[in-house]
Amino acid sequence: MTYADELTEAMTWLGEKGDTIFLGQSVAYPGNAVYKTLSGVPMEKRVELPVAEELQLGASIGLALTGKTVISIFPRMDFLMCCMNQLVNHLDKGLYTGTGKVIIRVCVGSTKPMHPGLQHCGDYTEAFKKLLKNICVLKIDLENRASIFYQVAYKNPGSYLLVEYGDLYND
């Protein structure tokens, strides 16, 4: 099974759960490699958002407060930096109690076949691990089955930040 197949399987499994909703860019319309991995997720569970990262994560936290498990998709890790207020000062602090959770799905941009520019391929995984005290940060590489990581994130308490690698989508 390829990396992309693993991610598709994981998203399909999450899409079958009654409490899940998917938010982000290119979740309802094609635009990046992440879109194809949502093929098994019903359209009524997808909410397409503009490029407004702070809004996206704030809305994700709000939906989690209503009991939803929100899969908040950020196609590039570089742009996750735009919502550090929501991530660090709200979600990580656990200020709001509820029965839902936020699973952040973020991708380190692909550098193959050509380099996309410095703002599209940064890997800040280790920095996030040091910064976030209450959000579990996990790398999904070829050695780690994506479906297992997403099941762990869904079944266990707390919020998660799962890091994918664009260069592996075609492997």
Predicted segments, located by residue:
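Thiamine diphosphate
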Residues: M1-N170
